[in-house]
Amino acid sequence: MNTLKICCIYIICLILIVTVCFPGKAQEADTLITSRIEEVTVDAVRTPDWKPVIKIDHRIIDNKDGVSIDELGNSLPSSKIQTNSRGESSIYIRGAGERQIMLFFDGVPLNTPWDNRIDLSLIPLEAVGEISVTRGIPSVTYGVNAISGVVNITSRTIDNSRYSGRFISRFGDNNSRYFSGMFSGGNNVLSYLVAGSHRTSEGFTLPGDFSHPDNPSNQRVNSGSDSFNLFSKVNYLYSRRGSLHISTLIIDSRKQVPPEIDVANPRYWRYPLWRRVGLAVSGKHTFRGTSASKIDYSISGTFLNAQIDQYKDSSFVEINDYENSKDIIFNGRAVYSGMISSTSFLRFVVAGFSTRHNEVILSEGNIARVYNQHCVSFGIEYEYFWKSISTLTGVSYDHSSIAVGDHNLLQNSIYDYSATAGIMYSINNSYSMNASVGRKTRFPTLRESFSGALGRFVANPDLKPETAYSMDAGFQGSHNRGRFDLIFFLTHLHDGIVRESLPEKKFRRINKDIIRTYGMELSYQNSMNDNISMLFRFTYLSALSKNEAGVFADTLEYKPQIMSSVYVLYSFRKNLESMMEINYTRKEYGLRHGIPSFEELPSYVLIHFRLGYTIGLSNKVSLEVFGRVNNIFDKLHYTQWGLPEAGRSFRGGASVEF
């Protein structure tokens, strides 16, 4: 609590000092720095707008100086990034796990169906232009399994009027290096974007007050990584009625997995291979005779090859087990939209995926095991808008089938449905209200049902789907220098899939009868003057499961009660800009290895600071030099028991943009 008080006093004093000593001035028109945080916006495009959509544009993304998506975690509403014992960085929104959330990159799913996860620490940032987040049960147009939210990541917009590019070099602690480049160009018919990066690091430094014989040095054991990424996109406008987009994403990585602290038999893992290659084709076409009837579509194919080497001990010399896996994934989605009257739209959607997972494990006799899953969703959605009211209702039929072995022996076939309904009412040009309800099912993944995770889990092929019943209501407002967003939410998750601790120091996934989650979210953004902007975000969350007595009293792991963040952006003078970020997390519980009961993680406050100076080399070329300190006070904190996070770290570098 003393740290929190110090943080609050510090930030208040900072605002007062800069307000008094550096009175705001109107910036010159050719200033290369934009000093306002304009991150929270409501999607006003004529697509389902029955829920507020929170957006993070490239200015916030650039100021994070990150190299991968996981470094943006605290910038997303009601979210936290958690690194698990496999070394994977995953996102949680409103306490919902990564398997309950779908991530899309330019409309193509990023989640790997084998476990419906994606390691965000391996997804590059250099081509990302905007991230938008829909919380709760989304539109049925997103297909299966998205029961708690959708994160849409879009690549940077191509300016067809000129060629543009950016080159970045960054350096940091533990011999961390990052180099990236991006170039785009074209004309009104054909345009392109190419981006690539290479990053390497020997690991991260632990906070100064951490001490444990399992990690005797200040550098985290086995925390290094190396990654090369390449993204390309071509846009073709073949007529006034249609466009075609082709993109590729290649990620070639190697990473180490820090072993858990104070665990009898931790994982001594390394990934000598993690390679993902994807090709996607998407487009839209407006039909003749009407400008309101169109089809949007995307199809993609992805190949993922990963290997885990398990070592005997912390010397990382002798390999005693390994797992090699290959995934082939096909995704598809088509949405037909038609205006059936001057005030209503009708949409038809078909979306789904087909995946094949092959794995070979040394301890299981090097026998190739094959798993197949096919999921499809057929949906219909009706949107009505009249004057200040917009409503939406949708239903879908969802199906999942799982087959095991080369002969596709059917293991199970599950059918279910999803339904959503929502309303948004604009009180005037500045204020609006919204409410929504929904039901949606998530099918168990192949890994949840059949994988032992190299001896860490006991498989449970009898897992049932989990079904979410959700509702939320909100109030939004805006003024000429900012806006706010207040939302209340409630979710009942039936047969929720959670893990339990077993006596033999293993885990098993089971279905909980009912999990209840409720809370509130508040976002407030304000540009105080042309020099100072701030963004405040606060989430209160209560998540409990029903016990045998029928009372909501059982604790759940890694669902923090309080999450809050503050961003303050200040321009001292032309081209000199600073940003301070404060993150606060409180009252979170987790299972420790071999202990059947939950234990509370320590609360923490993290403060980060950035300073950047931009030089205009010409009318079209700018150079920025920056420095950044993360976790200024070197705070020891955990997002999962046994896995301490990084202490104070430094990074700096330069970027050239033209």
Protein language model annotation of sequence segments:
Residues 108-136:
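Short acidic/polar hinge/loop motifs at secondary-structure boundaries
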